[in-house]
C-alpha cells in the first residue's frame, strides 16, 4: 500500500460493463521526498485509481495496487489495477 494524491478525474467514452457508474481518479504516488515537500509530485508517474469515496482533487489516499486492488470486489471480477482504500486526514513524519 502506498500514499498518493488525487490530481484529477478520468472520464471514459466507453467503459467495461463491470465499471459502469464507477468513479475513476488520476493520482500521483507520493514518496518521502514528496511528503517532505522536497520534490514536486507532478514530475513522476500517474495512476488511474478506482475511487468508491468521491475523493476530491488535492486529497491524500491510501492506494492498493495489483491483485490486492481487485479484492474489495471479490467474488466479482473487475479490471482494476489501483484502488483507493482510504482517504487520509493527515500524515505525520518523524525525523529519525
What does each model-found stretch correspond to?
Residues 62-96:
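C-terminal structural segments of small proteins and small subunits
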Residues 18-27:
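Short aromatic-glycine-enriched beta-strand elements
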Residues 39-47:
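Short, structured beta-strand/loop micro-motifs enriched in basic residues and often containing a Trp
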Residues 9, 30, 66-67:
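Short, surface-exposed secondary-structure boundary micro-motifs
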Amino acid at each position: 500500500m502506498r500514499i498518493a494524491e488525487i490530481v484529477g478525474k478520468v472520464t471514459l467514452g466507453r467503459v467495461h460493463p463491470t465499471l459502469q457508474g464507477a468513479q475513476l481518479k488520476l493520482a500521483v504516488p507520493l514518496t518521502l521526498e514528496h511528503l517532505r515537500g522536497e520534490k514536486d509530485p507532478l514530475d513522476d508517474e500517474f495512476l488511474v485509481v478506482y475511487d468508491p469515496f468521491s475523493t476530491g482533487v488535492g486529497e491524500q489516499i491510501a492506494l492498493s495496487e495489483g491483485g490486492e486492488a481487485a479484492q474489495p470486489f471479490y467474488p466479482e471480477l473487475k479490471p482494476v489495477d489501483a484502488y483507493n482504500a482510504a482517504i487520509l486526514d493527515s500524515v505525520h513524519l518523524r525525523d529519525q
